[in-house]
Amino acid sequence: MKVYQTNEIKNIALLGNDGSGKTTLTEALLYESGVIKRRGRITAKNTVSDYFPVEQEYGYSVFSTVFHVEWNGKKLNIIDCPGSDDFVGAAMTALNVTDTAILLLNGQYGPEVGTQNHFRYTEKLGKPVIFLVNQLDNEKCDYDQVLEQLKSIYGSKVVPVQYPIATGPNFNSLIDVLLMKKYSWGPDGGEPKIEDIPAEEMEKAKEWNKNLIEAAAEHDEGLMEKFFEKDSLTEDEMREGIRKGLASRGMFPVFCVCAGKDMGVRRLMEFLGNVVPFVSEMPKVHNTRGEVVEPDSNGPTSLYFFKTAVEPHIGDVQYFKVMSGKVHEGDDLTNADRGSKERMAQLFVCAGANRIKVEELCAGDIGCTVKLKDVRTGNTLNGKGAENRFNFIKYPNSKYSRAIKPLNEADTEKLMAVLNRMREEDPTWVIEQSKELRQTIVHGQGEFHLRTLKWRLENNEKLQIKYEEPKIPYRETITKAARADYRHKKQSGGAGQFGEVHLIVEPYYEGMPMPDTYKFNGQEFKINVKGTEEVPLEWGGKLVFVNSIVGGSIDARFMPAILKGIMSRMEQGPLTGSYARDVRVIVYDGKMHPVDSNEISFMLAGRNAFSEAFKNAGPKILEPIYDVEVFVPSDKMGDVMGDLQGRRAMIMGMSSESGYEKLVAKVPLKEMSSYSTALSSLTGGRASFIMKFASYELVPSDVQEKLMKEFESKQDKDE
């Protein structure tokens, strides 16, 4: 295969909602470019994309597919991404290593929730966007309505380059207002018949052509002057204007295809090859030090590894982008993230599961390799003279979590190893072994995300597992001061155990003054601080431990044991066994025995005195609250708001964004357990949401009472 230079390479992400036809379009692109001899079908399970068994089982893309096409001396690297928001990590990864995004739309639905989500990602990254309306042969397709929806959402930057003469089952022709030609196809699609525009379409075509010329001229001062002079531009001038408009996101061209019948695909590739910006024309990339890294094939070599796929009989197939320089088989490189040395194995360019061996890849190109010993997704490999490190991708917070356990306890270690390996394939997985909750928790993007994980574990790894509701990481605290004392005494012949601790607890906040007197039941307790220790708690908040012992009632050597006992109780709070936080403890008195006192005695005395005082100090349970943003169609706003209010949500605000209503709320984590499934059901899959931790807040009194009863009941059963 030819070695393509940087100025011959274009990298494109193919995005779209589930059902928009990305896999079918991929087949048509590969067929038209000669990479495959026959187009596969999803129902036949023989497509280049969706070749993993789990994808064929469910009929949906789960992983991104990297492929390339060669067209008129250009190489187009295209990454076909899953449409479901459950697999958003693949789309975000693809956008970070490509330069242009194609947003594919199902002609019968127009912009959907996936379109909105993907557009937001392109917006954040400043990537050019082409809208591509597919399935024009569907009887419910209304191209004009789709175009109006796009303009309503994204404004005047939406500029059509093509329009169908008719849609529905009889679709077989379109007008291209850049070339001012009619394209038509026979029943099998493929190579079009290109003709002059018929008279009945000429008026509309001229109007749309003028709109396109004006839009193209806006992005180049020289073109604008020519347009004012001649009221027109040549085809090449229009292409140049569109290229600049695309690159600056000042223009979003709209194209038409019927991928299932291979109509319009060849013309799309012509546009991609002729107009879409090259790697070298896009904004410069920066490394983690903020330095510009030029896509220069003559510079030092740097590779960014953005994807790992585990394939049977092969192992890890690792995909990379050449950020600078060139790479060859046998090159010695250094892992900037792990410090290890790597020798590059064979190099390939990709077409799904099929790979073509190449000798060299230049800056800007995308390829894959196998048998690297210590490379992870997100790592950078550098050649001599390069000291780059790239950290492009910030994945979204998890939205759906379940505790996971093997049905056979003996498989626990194997399960953890497999989960960690799978995280290399999909970094949006978060695997948490919670000491606090005593559960292994898998955090993902949705119910379907976890369903595919279960299928893969059971079918690929032969691991039988079950999901459970994850426990909620509640916290416990107090709202007023209280005191208690406790004597630990044990005598069983010989040396015994004795320790007595008197202490005060009170709620603590940063910068809180230290009183010198406390009063309980009419009795005053004067405090003479001898020492203070602030303990930052790994679960949040603080414990402030104050030594106020006077007269030597407790030796200083026993104070660490008292603190240890208190800490052990804070790790298992008295109300529900949850972590306690934000407490100040003042040890002001106690007793020792000259023979029987020891560390264990004072640890137990401190633990029990703290527990008793805590229960008398207005104890409260805190629950995690999350900031939630829901993107919902206007006609479903009332239903979604009502559902959130039923989840104890506090509605913080509403606004319009990208054609959808945005609802902002604070919601207890307990109420978000199956929200992704509920929201999909409520809106017919037309809404999406994001969530992130906000704070801990007091639970309502009825919820606290219920939680305490559940804990007491469990304690009774355990005993």
Where are these regions (language model features)?
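Structural and coupling elements of P-loop NTPases
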Residues: M1-E719
